C-alpha cells in the first residue's frame, strides 16, 4: 500500500475526529461561561501534541513502521490539530477586546501543548523499554 493512501485515510479520520470534538465541546459548553472560548481547538491541539510525541518516539525506537508514522502523524494528527484556527481565534479575541482571554488561550496552547509533548514522549519511552 502506498504511503500517500495511509496519509489520506488518516487525514480523513483526523478531520472527522476534530469535527466530532468541536460538536461535543460546543454542545457541552454552550450555556457556560466558557461557551465562547475556543476550547475544542485547544483540546485537539494538546491531544495532537501528545499523540505526535508518542508515535514519533515509538517510531524513532523502531517500534512503529514508517507507513504507520505517516498515516498517524502526518495524516490523522495533521488533520486533527490546527494552527491556523488557533491563530485566527486568537486574533478574533484580540479584535473583540478580549486580550486577556486571548493571552490565556495562546499560553494554554503553548504550555499545555509542550507539557503534552513531554508526557507523550515519556510514556512512549517507558512503553518502548527506555527512559
Swiss-Prot record:
A molecular function GO annotation: metal ion binding
Keywords for this protein: Cell membrane, Ion channel, Ion transport, Membrane, Metal-binding, Plasmid, Sodium, Transmembrane, Transmembrane helix, Transport
What reaction does this enzyme carry out catalytically? Answer: fluoride(in) = fluoride(out)
Q: Which domain of life is it from?
A: Bacteria
Q: Localized where?
A: Cell membrane
A family per Pfam: CRCB
Segments crossing the lipid bilayer: 5-25, 39-59, 70-90, 104-124
Query: What's a BP term from Gene Ontology annotated to this protein?
Result: cellular detoxification of fluoride
Does the entry feature the keyword Cell division, yes or no?
no
Its Gene Ontology cellular component terms are: plasma membrane
Give the regulation of activity.
Na(+) is not transported, but it plays an essential structural role and its presence is essential for fluoride channel function.
**Residues given in the record as Na(+) binding sites:** 78, 81
| Membrane topology annotation | Multi-pass membrane protein
Chief localization: membrane
What NCBIfam families does this protein map onto? crcB
Protein function = Fluoride-specific ion channel. Important for reducing fluoride concentration in the cell, thus reducing its toxicity.
Task: Give the family per the record.
Answer: Belongs to the fluoride channel Fluc/FEX (TC 1.A.43) family.
Name of this protein:
Fluoride-specific ion channel FluC 2
Organism of provenance: Deinococcus geothermalis (strain DSM 11300 / CIP 105573 / AG-3a)
Gene transcribed to yield this protein: fluC2
Amino acid at each position: 500500500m502506498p504511503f500517500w493512501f495511509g496519509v489520506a485515510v488518516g487525514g480523513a479520520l483526523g478531520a472527522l475526529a476534530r469535527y466530532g470534538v468541536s460538536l461535543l465541546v460546543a454542545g457541552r459548553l454552550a450555556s457556560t461561561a466558557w461557551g465562547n472560548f475556543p476550547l475544542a481547538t485547544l483540546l485537539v491541539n494538546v491531544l495532537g501534541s501528545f499523540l505526535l510525541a508518542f508515535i514519533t518516539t515509538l517510531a524513532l525506537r523502531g517500534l512503529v513502521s514508517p507507513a504507520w508514522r505517516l498515516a498517524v502523524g502526518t495524516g490523522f494528527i495533521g488533520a486533527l490539530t490546527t494552527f491556523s484556527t488557533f491563530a485566527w481565534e486568537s486574533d478574533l479575541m484580540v479584535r473583540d477586546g478580549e486580550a486577556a482571554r486571548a493571552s490565556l488561550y495562546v499560553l494554554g496552547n503553548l504550555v499545555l501543548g509542550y507539557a503534552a509533548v513531554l508526557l507523550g514522549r515519556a510514556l512512549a519511552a517507558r512503553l518502548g523499554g527506555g527512559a
